[in-house]
Curated annotation (Swiss-Prot), chain A:
Reaction equations catalysed: RNA(n) + a ribonucleoside 5'-triphosphate = RNA(n+1) + diphosphate
Protein name per its UniProtKB record: DNA-directed RNA polymerase subunit beta C-terminal section
Any one GO MF annotation of this record: DNA-directed RNA polymerase activity
InterPro entries hit by this protein: DNA-dir_RNA_pol_su2, DNA-dir_RNAP_su2_dom, DNA-dir_RNAP_su2_hyb_sf, Hint_dom_sf, Homing_endonucl, RNA_pol_bsu_CS, RNA_pol_Rpb2_7, RNA_pol_RPB2_OB-fold
Swiss-Prot record, chain B:
Name used for this protein in its record: DNA-directed RNA polymerase subunit beta N-terminal section
Cellular component terms per the entry's GO annotation: chloroplast; DNA-directed RNA polymerase complex; mitochondrion
UniProt record similarity statement: Belongs to the RNA polymerase beta chain family.
Coarse class of the protein's main subcellular location: plastid
Originating organism: Stigeoclonium helveticum
Localization: Plastid, Chloroplast
Subunit note: In plastids the minimal PEP RNA polymerase catalytic core is composed of four subunits: alpha, beta, beta', and beta''. When a (nuclear-encoded) sigma factor is associated with the core the holoenzyme is formed, which can initiate transcription.
Length: 1080, 696
């Protein structure tokens, strides 16, 4: 037996969750249920969670419900609730969301998380931020408020001579670089409280950048340090200025500033490193090497105990420099994990490695210290650093509690302020119940809240209690979930008796109708025990007489009323966003327009189901500025799309070879990830042939009449001209011109430069057909005709500004092809020599029929157009679509790029675009498995997304010049206001037909009555009134027709073989039979 | 007595126990599979000692891992031994193989700061299944032809299918490869003609595939015109051909002592060989292109030896028609390699213990249990069985029966993935063997990348590793108890038929008939019932009380029965009123025997259900008065409680089912005292309890 002396009292601590975020953003917390001084047994409940009460899983409320229709607000299972549920917070839930921000590098520098945002200096926007630029704990934030301040440099830093820089630093001069405010702000529609902030001072992948940086700047650094060391240390101003400069230079500032304090052992390490760098002390280097060697060894052991031994040794070595005098949390930088970086050291030179080592220890490890110590301390094993009591001291403090930060603030302040690279900030939002929320009971009786009524308007019980919720009585019979009625009535009894019931399902073991008899007996005892006789009326068991809250009148019939357990369901709204990112462009009749600039007035290229191209106005444009989620990115040689996961792609199964558009379907992107699918790039352009007429001009006071052109010839001519021609006024007759008799008189010259034989051949054919004569000289074809000149002159712009005239869009598909091919002939020869060789070869060997596919490919590759005009490039890709093909725009050469041509260096003055025309392979396949040129990925994304909806549901879009058909935003059409369900087939022209349940009700009411109503009242009422208005409006003589029901009646009677008819009296009172079907 | 009634097993036990099993045996088993790793000269060998593996404590606890966006995992260390036979050195070292994600107490994993659940997958258990296939002969769908197939389902590796097609030809089928005549396949597996035809009761049935080949008319003429011997054979052939229509002929043939069946068959194919050779001579061009033989693709060459069969198999799967004397050997070698790779290599094909057990049982074989790959005997006996099934002597299997379906728990899935990771590691090590210079050290060979990569892949992309549904504790718990037929190795939701989605009699007490999602996943994603458990074999078991002479033996405890064991038992429902002494009521009692409901006297009853809740899932058992609800609505009711948002103030339901407490406690969301004691401190942050512990 143990005596009382041998009893040990051990405290066991249970830490509780406080508003943790769950995967679905609901909150998780613990609510203690025990009181101090209570005795608990093992297994007893200590604390509830967010969805339990007294250890019982409970997620809802027992509320007073009645099954009654209320002004039609119960339509389609909708629910009517009392405002009490809102104001008493009965259905209020807390949702916790996490927002992340991290700094990134752009060409001008690294972003910075700071409160120091110049642009907002004079506003109140920064008031709630702490000095690091992060919203303070507990701050109540609204939409648009800054969560984390961040600035992005937008201008590269100017290189300043080093002495100037030093001068600036010493005098504390700050150079303001251009920055942009890129703060994280509270998204739309959110009003929430900051409940947790986590800062991350380091990022793994950054270490490498650091290395480079250190390497680059080491000279400057050394210089500064040397400078400093030679000066008096008490010069605080200077050290500070130096510090600030370093802050800009490297993130090592934390280090340097620490160094100034001279209390930390780190300083000495650092100093030592620097010395070595400057003077290469051989002795010390050796020592350090020893230390490193030790580290290498020790890192391979995983036993902590062993590590600890090494540690002591290691520290002893370091104490040579300086032992810590005071508590310094930074001391723990020398932690076991540091050694894991061993591999890095090996790669680096000793000098570099030293710096790096110190740096890594700071960056990587300072955060882990707490948790590590904590673990050790709590386990009660040998303390990790037995000789330093502060280890356990730090360890005991909870890592995440702000108090710990508080303690450490002095030492780690600069660390924090300058090193934060990413912040997680948690916002807790209170969501009260509102219209549109989904609620449900436990029997599958779900509905959407349609109206919130003031409690005085709700129907009330005989004792005056207003009901909380009105459910549709039609929701019970057809659904056959009678359990809800039992529950509701037993709830009523339980509420009045103050009892709770736990009933296992399948209680038939206790006799037939066990549930019903139990419920009624409980109701009865509630009546007898409370003395409230209305609770149970034998005539209407389970039903109560309710009173209308608005009038105080009793309802006609007794109503099922009782307490039911109702729950609030999460809403899944993300389903509704199907969009693209802003870098997509949409094809409209006004050219390619960025997605965010499209208006409903634009005509957007859409695709009919039969594959025909039609221009339509978008019906709606969607803009979600704060989308947060994942995007689907598909990139291929021929297509490039970046869309939300539920954006619908216009694809078909990859294996199907047929070119028809029948197999294409709109499938959400998330469902085709990784699948072999084919996209579509072309359309059929159904247009009549266009006839171009050259407008008339006045020449020498003679009107030259309009000229109808031969389209084939004209298109060929025009195509070549727009590519390589110009029109000019030849005012001074120069020698060249005089040489050509025919045109010497005319100053209006249209010229085409000929570089290819083929082009000359074509023009030789074409120009005579058009009725012009031409000269060929010096690789130029010259036509002198004023009419032609007058038309072409305005189009004859400099190369970068060229575009196609509007009539081009009226061309038929074949005509568009002719024009396009004509334009391309100009470039064909040069780029196509390979193909032509192959073609000639194959024709010689008469193998052309053997390799048609091969040849086609060649053609595809060959058809390209080159231009420096952005507009023309866009026009051509549109023309390609009209031609039943498609065009991909590539930026061939950037402005300012240099290429050599014939040994000469040529600098591009403009961007050069290449438009490659795809004729046959317009169904780019993805994931076909032949080769892996394409890219398909799902990326996290935060930012704006856009979309539009068009009647045809499919529109033409391109990203990076690669165009493709894709689905529009939303197709399910309008949503019912009450039930929030898509109307789909139930709506026509905005009207809404009867709901499913209402139809059942009508069936019960009697189809005969309905028929009667429709035939008599409704039909005559509407049509009669319409016709009368018609007559009134158009001032016709009034004529009142026969009621429809009357017609029906006559037809019925005629069907019974009765001789019956409608007769109309003439002016002369002669009766004339009227045919029933022709009656007005 | 009363406590028995309220006994309900822990709800997330399934996940925890499975992970425990993984740590105890699965991990060791998987490591052992890779042991030892040797280089090609066999002078270097790496041997792991998996039994002594150690896990370092995780850096973060599961809660911190979520906050820091880290993975809740621990490092796996295994002692490794490097034997250098050249230098006669043995080195020994602990090596780190990788990070193993740990399951939290609540039964989920934390990967990159997000709680993830690995849901249990129901797959067809490894073994052999016979099934019937119905073909429409004409388009009017009036005349159906019944054909049969046997399917070898492996735990890992390709599924082999022996099937009889519309034309009664027998094939061996594999996914993504053209089908192969079964004779080829059997010969290719290593059987000889003699064994093959002697061990089958109807050897000629196998030759059916070639009968059409023999039909070529001019052969008969040719043969006849040759000499007497040939004419005789031709006659035999004719008779054989007729025999498929009329079996009496063959009987008479059998009876006449000249023609033993085997002889007959031998004759037939020897004739075929001679014919073919001749033909090759006659039409060298045609045979080279293979045109003649492939007029109808179905007509294959006959193979008389394994070598020939392998040649043919390889030419078939690679779709090369030309077999010349030059590439003959190569083809045979490749064919052999192919078959070995697909079915004989323990690294790529694995029946699993249960697969071997079930095969042995079904085919009455006695192969050793360590034989985890397919053998030629398996296929041979399966062929024999298939032919018997065709004759109607044996029945087909019901693939929807739960005895034929197994649950792959989270541990099985992780174990498989670790297997993949270790395979990569092994490959890595092997390649390092070839590049080493001097005296290697153990650490040089090991890297954590292969294993970590494989696990990361699994947790990140596998559809069975899901983002945990944490809306409320019920959602979390049902997520962990979910059973799905989807995912790799399962069915796809587009091709799933109604049969798979439907309820099967064996679901009783194992899979909830109510709780399943609405929509396209209906019936494919299921929920485990409250009392069910998954045994180490992956079969779902449900408890019953033993009934002895009409008395329910409650004190004898639960008898957990799997679907197979339950098949023959007579089971009474759980909601019967018992007498005080535990006897069933007198008179006829409604009982169930597999799929029929009858009434029997109490003395015939074998078992009684434990509770009415036994047949429904956790979420469903939260619905009060469930028996009064239509099943569709009960389904919605069960599903919607999972979507309920925790409220700032919620209430206990006035009407409940009594299982609410268990849900709260088993979900691990509420805190329960680990030991008794005095509450010393309570705040929103922590609770401190002073426990008295006596020192001994």
């Amino acid at each position: 037996m143990s005596t009382s002396q041998s009893l040990n009292i051990i405290p066991i601590e249970y830490s509780l969750q406080t508003y943790q975020r769950s995967n679905q953003d609901t909150s998780m917390l613990h609510r203690p249920v025990v009181k101090e001084g209570e005795w608990v047994q093992a297994g007893d409940l200590l604390s509830d969670c967010a969805s339990s009460i007294g250890g019982e899983f409970s997620i809802g409320q027992n509320i007073l419900i009645a099954y009654l229709p209320w002004e039609g607000y119960n339509y389609e299972d909708a629910i009517l609730i009392s405002e009490r549920l809102v104001y008493d917070d009965l259905y209020t839930s807390i949702h916790i969301e996490r927002y992340d921000i991290s700094t990134e590098k752009n060409p001008y520098g690294i972003e910075k998380i700071t409160k120091d945002i110049v642009l907002l200096k004079d506003t109140t926007e920064l008031n709630h931020l702490d000095k690091n630029g992060i919203a303070q704990l507990g701050a109540w934030l609204k939409e648009g408020d800054i969560l984390v301040g961040k600035i992005t440099p937008t201008e590269s830093k100017k290189e300043v001579a080093r002495y100037v820089q030093l001068y600036n630093d010493i005098l504390g001069k700050k150079i303001n670089y251009a920055i942009r405010d890129s703060s994280l702000r509270v998204p739309r529609g959110l009003e929430a409280k900051v409940i947790r902030v986590k800062t991350f001072p380091e990022r793994k992948n950054e270490t490498k950048n650091w290395e480079n940086k250190i390497g680059l700047k080491s000279k400057a650094l050394a210089f500064s340090v040397q400078h400093f060391l030679s000066k008096n240390q008490s010069n605080k101003k200077r050290t500070l200025s130096l510090k600030s400069k370093w802050e800009k230079e490297t993130s090592l500032s934390s280090f340097s500033s620490l160094a100034w304090q001279k209390k930390s052992p780190l300083f000495f390490v650092f100093k030592n490193g620097i010395f070595e760098k400057l003077k290469n002390f051989p002795k010390k280097k050796k020592k350090n090497e020893r230390v490193f060697a030790l580290k290498k060894k020790s890192s391979k052991k995983f036993r902590f105990f062993e590590l600890q031994k090494k540690f002591r040794f290691f520290f002893r070595n370091f104490f040579f420099f300086k032992a810590p005098k005071k508590k310094s949390p930074l001391f723990f930088f020398f932690k076991s994990e540091t050694f894991d970086k061993e591999r890095n050291f090996q790669k680096m030179s000793p000098n570099q490695s030293k710096q790096n080592w110190v740096k890594i220890s700071i960056k990587k490890e300072w955060q882990k210290v707490g948790s590590f110590g904590k673990k050790k301390a709590s386990k009660g094993k040998i303390s990790f650093f037995p000789s330093f009591p502060q280890a356990s001291l730090v360890g005991k403090a909870s890592f995440f509690s702000p108090s710990r930060f508080e303690k450490k603030r002095d030492a780690s302040n600069f660390l924090k302020s300058s090193c934060i690279s990413s912040v997680h900030i948690y916002l807790a939002e209170k969501r009260k119940v509102q219209v549109g929320d989904k609620m449900a009971g436990r029997h599958g009786n779900k509905g959407i809240i349609s109206q919130i009524l003031p409690r005085q308007d709700m129907p009330y019980l005989p004792d005056g209690t207003p009901i909380d919720m009105a459910l549709n009585p039609l929701g019970v019979p057809s659904r056959m979930n009678v359990g809800q009625i039992y529950e509701c009535l037993l709830g009523l009894a339980g509420k009045h008796l103050g009892e709770q019931y736990r009933i296992q399902p399948f209680d038939e073991a206790f006799g037939p109708e066990a549930s019903r008899s139990f419920v009624f007996s409980k109701l009865y005892s509630a009546k007898t025990k409370t003395g409230q006789s209305w609770l149970f009326q034998p005539t209407n068991p389970g039903k109560l007489k309710l009173f209308d809250g608005r009038t105080g009148n009793c309802f006609d019939q007794a109503i099922t009323t009782g307490y039911s357990y109702m729950i609030k369901l999460v809403h899944l709204v993300d389903e509704k966003i199907h969009c693209l990112t802003v870098d997509h462009e949409v094809l409209t009749t006004k050219g390619w327009i960025p997605l965010n600039k499209v208006k409903t007035s634009h005509f957007v290229a859409t695709l009919k189901k039969n594959g025909q191209l039609v221009y339509q106005n978008p019906t709606n444009i969607y803009h979600y500025p704060e989308f947060k989620g994942e995007l689907y990115h598909i990139k291929n040689v021929n297509l490039d799309l970046l869309v939300t996961l539920n954006h619908r792609m216009y694809v078909k199964n990859g294996i199907i070879e047929a070119t028809s558009s029948v197999d294409y379907q709109l499938i959400p992107a998330k469902d085709i990830v990784g699948q072999h699918k084919k996209y579509c790039k072309t359309a059929f352009w159904d247009k009549e042939n266009y006839q171009f007429i050259l407008p008339s001009v006045i020449s020498n006071s003679i009107v030259i009449p309009e000229k109808t052109m031969n389209m084939e010839a004209w298109l060929q001519f025009f195509g070549i001209w727009i590519a390589e021609g110009w029109a000019l006024t030849n005012t001074i007759s120069n020698n060249n011109v005089t040489n050509f008799n025919q045109s010497s008189s005319s100053p209006y010259v249209v010229q085409i430069s000929i570089k290819k034989k083929k082009v000359l051949e074509i023009l030789n054919n074409v120009i005579p057909i058009l009725g012009y004569s031409f000269n060929y000289y010096d690789n130029n074809i010259t036509i002198c005709d004023k009419q032609l000149w007058a038309y072409l002159r305005p189009l004859s712009l400099g190369n970068p500004y060229r575009k196609l005239p509007i009539w081009v869009w009226d061309l038929s598909q074949d005509q568009a092809r002719v024009l396009l091919l004509a334009m391309i002939t100009v470039f064909k020869n040069g780029t196509n020599s390979k193909w032509e060789k192959a073609a000639s070869l194959s024709s010689r060997l008469s193998l052309a029929s053997v390799f048609p596919e091969f040849l086609k490919k060649r053609i595809d590759k060959g058809l390209s157009y080159y231009t420096s005009s952005v507009e023309l490039a866009d026009d051509i890709s549109r023309l390609a679509l009209h031609a039943g093909w498609s065009g991909n725009n590539y930026l061939l050469k950037k402005k300012g790029s240099i290429s050599s041509f014939d040994g000469k260096q040529i600098i591009c003055q403009f961007d050069i675009w290449r438009i490659s025309i795809i004729q046959s392979k317009n169904q780019p396949a993805v994931n076909h498995g032949y080769h892996s040129k394409g890219k398909e990925e799902v990326l996290p994304y935060q930012g704006a997304v856009y979309c539009l909806s068009v009647p045809n549901e499919i529109f033409y879009v391109r990203r990076n010049g690669l165009s493709v058909w894709t689905g529009n935003s939303r197709s399910s059409g309008p949503y019912s206001l009450i039930t929030q369900q898509p109307l789909k087939g139930r709506s026509k022209h905005g009207g809404q037909r009867l709901g499913e349940m209402e139809v059942w009700a009508i069936e019960a009411y009697g189809a005969a009555f309905t028929l009667l109503e429709l035939l008599t009242i409704k039909s005559d009422d509407v049509t009669g009134r319409l016709t009368i208005w018609d007559y009134v409006l158009y001032k016709k003589p009034l004529y009142i027709g026969t009621p429809a029901s009357f017609k029906v009646l006559i037809c019925e009677l005629q069907a019974l073989c009765l001789d019956i008819g409608i007769y109309k009296a003439d002016k002369s009172n002669i009766l004339k039979q009227i045919n029933v079907s022709s009656m007005g | 007595m009363a406590i028995e009634k309220y006994f309900i097993p822990d709800f997330v036990e399934l996940q925890r126990r499975s992970f425990q099993r993984f740590l105890e045996t699965g991990l060791i088993e998987e490591l052992n599979k890779r042991n030892p790793i040797t280089n090609s000269q066999k002078d270097l060998e790496i041997l792991l000692y998996p039994e002594y593996y150690k896990l370092a404590p995780p850096r973060w606890n599961s809660l911190d891992a979520i906050l820091l966006s880290k993975t809740y995992s621990c490092r796996l260390y295994v002692p490794a031994q490097l034997t250098n036979r050249k230098t006669k050195q043995i080195m020994f070292k602990w090596v780190q193989l990788g990070d193993i994600p740990l399951m939290s107490k609540r039964g989920h994993f934390v990967v990159n700061g997000a709680a993830r659940v690995i849901i249990n997958q129901i797959v067809r258990g490894p073994g052999l299944y016979f099934s019937e296939i119905q073909y429409n002969v004409d388009s009017s769908k009036k005349t159906l032809v019944r054909r049969y197939a046997a399917e070898f389902i492996s735990m890992r590796g390709t599924w082999l299918r022996l099937s009889i097609d519309k034309e009664k030809m027998i094939w061996a089928e594999l996914k993504k490869t053209p089908k192969i005549p079964l004779v080829w396949f059997l010969l290719g597996m290593g059987l000889t003609e003699k064994i093959l035809f002697q061990s089958l009761t109807q050897p000629k049935r196998l030759l059916y595939n070639y009968l059409d080949y023999l039909k070529i008319d001019n052969l008969a003429i040719d043969v006849k015109s040759q000499n007497d011997a040939f004419a005789k054979r031709a006659l035999l052939r004719e008779l054989l051909l007729k025999s498929k229509l009329n079996s009496s002929n063959i009987k008479t043939l059998k009876n006449s002592k000249d023609f033993k069946p085997l002889l007959l068959v031998n004759d037939i194919y020897s004739e075929m060989h001679s014919y073919k050779e001749k033909e090759n001579r006659r039409y060298p061009l045609n045979s080279q292109n293979g045109d003649l033989a492939d007029e109808k693709e179905k007509i294959p060459y006959y193979a008389n030896s394994s070598l020939k069969a392998l040649e043919l198999i390889y030419s078939k799967i690679t779709n090369t028609k030309k077999i010349t004397n030059l590439n003959k050997k190569f083809f045979a070698k490749q064919g052999q390699k192919w078959i070995f790779k697909k079915f004989m290599n323990p690294r790529t094909y694995d029946l699993g213990l249960h697969g071997r057990l079930s095969l042995n049982k079904k085919l009455s074989l006695s192969l050793p249990l360590s034989q985890r790959t397919l053998t030629m005997y398996d296929v041979l006996v399966a062929t024999e069985h298939l032919l018997r099934v065709e004759q109607g002597l044996l029945g087909t299997d019901d693939i929807d029966n739960l005895k034929n379906r197994r649950v792959r728990t989270s541990s099985d899935l992780i174990q498989m993935q670790i297997g993949i990771g270790l395979l990569r590691l092994e490959k890595n090590i092997r390649s390092k063997f070839t590049t080493i210079k001097g005296v290697p050290k153990i650490n040089y060979f090991f890297s954590t990348k292969p294993l970590n990569g494989a696990l990361k892949e699994f947790f990140g992309t596998n559809p069975l590793s899901q983002f945990m549904d944490m809306i409320n504790p019920l959602a979390e718990m049902t997520h962990k108890r979910r059973l799905t037929t989807l995912g790799p190795g399962g069915v796809s939701r587009d091709t799933a038929t109604m049969d798979i989605r439907g309820i099967h009699p064996t679901h009783y007490g194992r899979i909830c008939p109510v709780e399943t999602p609405e929509g396209k996943n209906a019936g494919l994603v299921n929920a485990l019932t409250t009392f069910a458990r998954v045994n180490p074999e992956g079969l779902i078991e449900t408890p019953f009380y033993k009934v002895y002479k009409g008395q329910v033996q409650k004190k004898a405890g639960f008898f957990y029965l799997s679907a197979e064991k339950e098949e023959k038992a007579i089971i009474a429902a759980g909601d019967l009123n018992l007498s005080k002494t535990g006897f069933l009521p007198k008179g006829l009692i409604p009982v169930r025997k597999f799929d029929e409901f009858t009434k029997v006297l109490r003395n015939y009853v074998d078992f009684m259900s434990v509770s009415p809740l036994q047949m429904i899932s956790v979420a469903t058992s939260l619905v009060p008065f469930l028996e009064h609800d239509d099943a569709n609505r009960a389904l919605m009711g069960a599903n919607m409680q999972r979507q309920a948002v925790p409220l700032v103030r919620s209430e206990q339901a006035i009407v409940g089912t009594g299982i609410e407490t268990r849900i709260a406690s088993d979900s691990g969301h509420v805190i329960r005292a680990k030991a008794g004691g005095l509450v010393g401190y309570v705040s929103g942050q922590k609770i401190r309890i002073y426990t008295f512990v006596s020192n001994f």
